[in-house]
Amino acid sequence: MTAAEIKDKVYDIIVSKMGVNRDQIKMESKFSDDLGADSLDTVELIMELESEFGVQIPDEDAEKIGTVQQAIDYIVNKK
């Protein structure tokens, strides 16, 4: 899976889980501040990323994933 494919899939998951429009999502978007996620939304997003990409994201790493770019970079580096 290429980085571009990972980005597209992450965007799809964000749209599905957070109920935002795709055009609202930017690479620098913060899940809480820009996309309106609360802590439960963020946990559900991390769980969906783990499931979709077959990666384990430990809690200490999940706490550092606050933007779309950070989520994509994390997955790219784990693949």
UniProtKB/Swiss-Prot annotation:
Chain ranges of the Carrier domain: 4-79
Subcellular location per the Swiss-Prot or TrEMBL entry: Cytoplasm
Family: Belongs to the acyl carrier protein (ACP) family.
Protein name, per record: Acyl carrier protein
PROSITE patterns recorded: CARRIER (PS50075), PHOSPHOPANTETHEINE (PS00012)
Taxonomic source organism: Pelodictyon phaeoclathratiforme (strain DSM 5477 / BU-1)
Source taxonomy: Bacteria, Pseudomonadati, Chlorobiota, Chlorobiia, Chlorobiales
Principal location listed in the UniProt entry: cytoplasm
Annotated GO CC locations: cytosol; membrane
Function: Carrier of the growing fatty acid chain in fatty acid biosynthesis.
Residue numbers of O-(pantetheine 4'-phosphoryl)serine PTMs: 39
